[in-house]
Amino acid sequence: MTPPTMLQTAPVESFNLNPKSTQQAINLKSDAKNGKVSFADWNEFKFAPIRESTVSRAMTRRYFADLDKFAESDIVIIGAGSAGLSAAYTLGKNRPDLKIAIIEASVSPGGGCWLGGQLFSAMVLRKPAHLFLDDMGLDYEDEGDYVVVKHAALFMSTLMSKVLQFPNIKLFNATAVEDLITRKDPATNLQRIAGVVVNWAQLDHDTQSCMDPNTINCNVVLSTSGHDGPFGAFTAKRLEQLGRAPRDVTAGFTKPSITTSKLQEPEPISNFQLGGMKGLDMNKAEDAIVKGTREVVPGLVIAGMELAEVDGSNRMGPTFGAMALSGVKAAESVLNVLELRKQQNEACYGAYKG
């Protein structure tokens, strides 16, 4: 049977609805008062003309170009909350040569960092997390052992705007990670993580959709998907399913030694067990999260509150210094193993040729 012929129309980039359209002045500053304020001549105001299909093409062309570009990434970050974006900011500043994809299930990035505790506006960060704010150029009130940002949304919007300006970083929001790509090392017979399985947020496994997903290969995955709740700690929960060891919530996962700075080989996936997050203790929690941020299994770094579910450490409540500095530590951990994991991936299926 002869396949149907595909018909294509030549794209129309733009057309002229108003050939007499001229440049219009909008001045956002005025010293006038008492009814004399005017930022523009609104009687003569008119937007430049555009065809609806031009808008569609402007969006879709760029989005699918990004899908193609980041299908093979150096690093994938799961979750665009405070820890994930802090890591992205640190990675973007230090390695502009790397392709970094951020996957966020929500339409609006930021996680739980748009407010402080109990819907209050101010954000508290214990020192020395103020140094991260200094690097971003963010103002705060210094209260001695801690600092206060006047609104949590100021922190998050500033951080987000800086991350999104990096040309080597792409945020895919409204996109869910529903599984992990694994590789088995023929030399050691151990599995490692080599990418993520993604889908539109409304079509992932939790919706019981039969829609097959898409994939992104990378050398290191950084997971910062948060704690508890139906979408929290996704990667840690999936690792436990991939592991062969029986679940023992009293034992938790093997914690790293914090008395040495020597890079340690992570545990195999087959040994992975969730520790289960403990109750709130601000003083214990923040130190534990930052110090414990690491590559937990080959190819996967876990940071932020997801790590509390892995290690069985305490939650910290409405103090956010550990989220920022766990992101910094995560960026360090990623960069320290990136070349090794890249070499292992290339030995498995060959180097990417794009």
Curated annotation (Swiss-Prot):
Reaction(s) catalysed by this chain's protein: [ADP-thiazole synthase]-L-cysteine + glycine + NAD(+) = [ADP-thiazole synthase]-dehydroalanine + ADP-5-ethyl-4-methylthiazole-2-carboxylate + nicotinamide + 3 H2O + 2 H(+)
Main subcellular localisation: cytoplasm
Subcellular location: Cytoplasm; Nucleus
Hydrolase in keyword set: no
InterPro entries for this protein: FAD/NAD-bd_sf, Sti35, Thi4_fam
Stored Pfam families: Thi4
Cofactors required: Fe cation
Range of residues in the leader sequence: none
2,3-didehydroalanine (Cys): residues carrying this PTM: 210
Residues given in the record as substrate binding sites: 83, 104-105, 112, 177, 212, 227, 305, 315-317
GO biological process assignments: thiamine biosynthetic process; thiazole biosynthetic process
UniProt KW keywords: Cytoplasm, Iron, Metal-binding, NAD, Nucleus, Thiamine biosynthesis, Transferase
Cofactor binding summary note: Binds 1 Fe cation per subunit.
GO molecular function: cysteine-dependent adenosine diphosphate thiazole synthase activity; iron ion binding
Enzyme Commission numbers on file: 2.4.2.60
Cellular component GO terms, alphabetical: cytosol; fungal biofilm matrix; nucleus
Class of the enzyme per the UniProt entry, highest EC level: transferase
Reported modifications of this chain: During the catalytic reaction, a sulfide is transferred from Cys-210 to a reaction intermediate, generating a dehydroalanine residue.
Membership in a protein family: Belongs to the THI4 family.
Function as written in the Swiss-Prot or TrEMBL entry: Involved in biosynthesis of the thiamine precursor thiazole. Catalyzes the conversion of NAD and glycine to adenosine diphosphate 5-(2-hydroxyethyl)-4-methylthiazole-2-carboxylic acid (ADT), an adenylated thiazole intermediate. The reaction includes an iron-dependent sulfide transfer from a conserved cysteine residue of the protein to a thiazole intermediate. The enzyme can only undergo a single turnover, which suggests it is a suicide enzyme. May have additional roles in adaptation to various stress conditions and in DNA damage tolerance.
Record-linked HAMAP family: THI4
Database matches in NCBIfam families: sulfide-dependent adenosine diphosphate thiazole synthase
Assembly, per entry: Homooctamer.
PANTHER family (UniProt xref): THIAMINE THIAZOLE SYNTHASE
Protein name, entry field: Thiamine thiazole synthase
Upper classification of the organism: Eukaryota, Fungi, Dikarya, Ascomycota, Saccharomycotina
Name of the coding gene: THI4
